[in-house]
Amino acid sequence: MTRLTRTGVAAIALVAATMCSIAGAPHVAAAACDGTYTIVVGGFGDGASTIFSGGVDQRVGYSAQLSSASVREGVNELNRLVRDQRQACPSQHAKVIGYSEGAAVAHIWVSENWATFDDVNAVLISDPKRQGGPGTDGLAGQFYAAVMGAPLYGADRNFGDIPTVSICTDDVICDSAAPSGWIGYLTGAHGNYSFDVDDYSDDGDGQWFNGVFMPW
């Protein structure tokens, strides 16, 4: 085989390989849109949302400070990320999970976006914006939290038609009159939850309060 012929064969092989890569690209993109897109928001001091384990697809990054400005930052970043993913994968279900201050971020996002976003569910773990009944409002719903201002201040259930699960277990953050009180908080009650995202379904709706499930 002459040098010219060898060069021609190599060029043809390179073109063929390139065409195969191009042809295979849509399949790879489709695979990335399979299943559920799980996005998580960590609590106070966990700006990288590292507390969660399991099949996490995206961790929201924000300042995670105890202020409404920080919560608004988290809501805006969550909104950007989840909408970017929806644009890339229009038919993919999204699951938003937040813990503590991150639960407030997820709570507010649902309240502000339920009318314009579907095929999504939310899991709120120790949500300070949890509205009482059973139990009492979370810390954000107490009168002294008014100094925080919007959007952190207040407690509600404005979830529209988005399936939302709230989980609160003897924890003053989500039930300000929890029996364990602040001593319980200091001894670990606030962390007595599962942070494996695979433990939470894609369609749960209602609340787990002190280990008992109740519908909204």
What are these regions (language model features)?
Residues 13-22, 99, 193-196, 200-204:
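Hydrophobic alpha-helical membrane segments, chiefly transmembrane helices and signal peptide h-regions
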Residues 76-166:
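Serine-dependent carboxylesterase/thioesterase catalytic core
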Residues 2-7, 18, 36-38, 50, ...:
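Residue-identity detector for threonine
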Residues 24, 53-54, 109, 113:
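Amphipathic, positively biased hydrophobic alpha-helical segments used for protein targeting
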Residues 1-30:
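Secretory targeting and sorting signals
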Residues 29-93, 130, 166-216:
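Active-site catalytic motif of lipid deacylating hydrolases and related acyltransferases
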